[in-house]
Curated annotation (Swiss-Prot):
GO CC terms: plasma membrane
Function noted in UniProt: NDH-1 shuttles electrons from NADH, via FMN and iron-sulfur (Fe-S) centers, to quinones in the respiratory chain. The immediate electron acceptor for the enzyme in this species is believed to be ubiquinone. Couples the redox reaction to proton translocation (for every two electrons transferred, four hydrogen ions are translocated across the cytoplasmic membrane), and thus conserves the redox energy in a proton gradient. This subunit may bind ubiquinone.
Gene name of this polypeptide: nuoH2
Protein localization: Cell inner membrane
Name assigned to this protein: NADH-quinone oxidoreductase subunit H 2
PROSITE patterns, A to Z: COMPLEX1_ND1_2 (PS00668)
Catalytic activity: a quinone + NADH + 5 H(+)(in) = a quinol + NAD(+) + 4 H(+)(out)
């Protein structure tokens, strides 16, 4: 097999594998959320389908597939169909930039654990050197899917929900982007692999500790909640005011695709937080494990951090009430934005004096 054909085959396998793992993670994040929130509310959560309700995501998926796919007569049909596809496509595209570990060797083939990564001439994995910028750009395009869903539905509830979502996501994107500037100043690179490499050697080298970026981490985490429209920032789908927000006119798999995009974005922001602030796939203590496990353990550490972030998402949902809309916007522009600018100034001073 030629080198180009082999490269394309490996790339195709990685694409299929990452999409499968991501969609499985999305399905079981929903299951975990229902279980944890159920326990918080003194309920059992899913228990009927399979042991401990583990097959509930399969039953939910089957239900969405078999439901009638209604197309209301008053909608703008091309944009109405395009909107959920755009939301899911941007969520899947952003995860393709994220590296999940170092390299994987099978026989004589060595490949980076990343869809867009390749092996360099020096035998080291090479990724896109502006990967972080691309992820921020791609995720910001997702707002178009929500805006199109509200406008094309020709419903006042959908339109109000999409307007809220667009304003909220644009507002919090500013503070989210600025919260990452401190990490970029410390690392001097947009490459996600380079940022992880600079944090290796122990947890004391992680940016949240060694670079004093705990304020930036708080800003990022808070803005990520708003970006993914999660409680307490779920104003676009406030049921008591807007029925179901921009989802109102959707049914069947089109309805499910918006939730798939939301949970996929949750996984993406958890990956980025792990890479930028918590050392990515590097272990907390170097040399902690025997060499035979070193190739597989980085993926374990990375997945463990992602699980911790997703659990915090769920915990916040079961704990905090929803903001009022004016409180939500004021919190972004009057608190998070000045705080993120102050963090940039302090980090720049720290880098200059170091």
């Amino acid at each position: 097999m030629g080198s180009i054909a082999l490269f394309l085959l490996v790339a195709l396998i990685k694409v299929v594998l990452v999409i499968f793992v991501l969609l499985t993670a999305v399905a079981y994040t929903v299951w975990l959320e229902r279980k944890v929130v159920g326990r918080m509310q003194n309920r059992w959560g899913p228990t009927r389908v399979g042991p401990f309700g583990l097959l509930q995501p399969l039953a939910d998926g089957l239900k969405f597939i078999l439901k009638e796919d209604l197309l209301p007569p008053h909608v703008n049909k091309p944009l109405y169909i395009l909107a959920p596809m755009l939301a899911v496509a941007m969520a899947l595209l952003s995860i393709s930039i994220v590296p999940f570990g170092g390299t994987l060797t099978i026989g004589h083939i060595t490949t980076p654990l990343q869809i867009t990564g390749i092996m360099g001439a020096n035998g080291q994995p090479v990724d896109i050197n502006i990967g972080l910028l691309i992820i921020l750009g791609v995720t910001s395009i997702g707002v178009y899917g929500i805006a199109l869903a509200g406008w094309s539905s020709n419903s006042k509830y959908s339109l109000l929900g999409s307007l809220r979502a667009s304003a909220q996501m644009v507002s919090y994107e500013v503070s989210l982007g600025l919260s990452l500037v401190g990490v970029l100043l410390l690392s001097g690179s947009f490459s996600l692999r380079e940022i992880v490499r600079l944090q290796q050697g122990g947890f004391w080298n992680w940016n949240i500790f060694g670079g004093f970026q705990f304020i930036a981490f708080f800003i990022y985490l808070t803005s990520a909640y708003a970006e993914t429209n999660r409680i307490p920032f779920d104003l676009p789908e406030a049921e008591t005011e807007l029925v179901a927000g921009y989802h109102t006119e959707y049914s069947s798999m089109k309805f499910a695709m918006f939730f798939m995009a939301e949970y996929a974005n949750m996984v993406t922001v958890a990956c980025i937080a792990s890479i930028l602030f918590l050392g990515g796939w590097s272990g907390p203590v170097p040399g902690f494990l025997p060499p035979i496990l070193q190739s597989l353990v980085p993926v374990f550490w990375f997945c463990l951090r992602i699980f911790a972030f997703l659990f915090i998402y769920i915990w916040v949902r079961g704990t905090l009430p929803r903001f009022r809309y004016d409180q939500l916007m004021a919190f972004s522009w009057k608190f998070l934005l000045p705080l993120s600018i102050a963090n940039i100034m302090v980090t720049a001073l720290f880098v200059a004096l170091k």
